[in-house]
Amino acid sequence: MSQIFHHSTNTLAKVSIFGGVFAAAATIWVVLEINRSPYVTRAHEAREQPVPFSHAHHVGGLGVDCRYCHTSVDKSAVAGIPPTKTCMNCHAQIWNQSPMLEPVRASFRDGTSIEWTRVHDLPDFAYFNHSAHVNKGIGCSTCHGRVDKMPLVWQEKSLQMEWCLECHRRPEKYVRPLSEVYNVAYEPPADQLDLGTRLVKDYGIKPRTSCSTCHR
């Protein structure tokens, strides 16, 4: 009986199957990379604000401590946005006629809140507690980056689940002494893993990666 298909058919079939698998894998890879990209996460994108508050000036230049403005960071889940009164503690005397700060003065006079543009916008299904992290040695700059060098704040990290899990699985790589939590210029020492392992034990850190830890 004569052969129905040409002998090259087997090769074409194998190439087609391999090509299909490769194309599917490449598509998945591209989708995942796009999902991690700043285009989706909006990382490193400075946001315009009603008042161009500069962390570079206030933190980097003047040395203002994070807790002066974010007063609840070590006490509650949210770090807190300072009321205008906090701004006016200084700006009632300094730059008190600056047109740039008129929205601050108007907010203070009228008792209305300034509508800041949110930068770190976690989805509603993700729970994050600031106090639980800073009180266990996770520094501000670990998540927020060098805000002392940011004229306008941007989101330094992706805030995606894989980024969170990296720290939850290996906290010894990131934990620091409590005295350095608010030091945004802190650099991990050469023996960070040894130090971190010791601090994880001292602080009683129990890494949790179960879904219910963050999705409540």
Regions found by a protein language model. Give the residues of each.
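Short Cys/His-rich "knuckle" micro-motifs
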Residues: 76-80, 97-101, 150-154, 174-177
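Nucleotide phosphate-binding site architecture
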Residues: 59, 88, 134
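Primarily the internal scaffold of c-type cytochrome electron-transfer domains
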Residues: 2-6, 94-126, 171-216
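Beta-hairpin (beta-strand-turn-beta-strand) motif
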Residues: 58, 92-93, 131
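Soluble extracytoplasmic domains of inner/organellar membrane proteins
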Residues: 124, 129-178
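N-terminal export/targeting leaders of redox proteins
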Residues: 1-52, 56-60, 64, 68, ...
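The canonical Cys-X-X-Cys-His
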Residues: 63-72, 84-93, 140-146, 163-170, ...
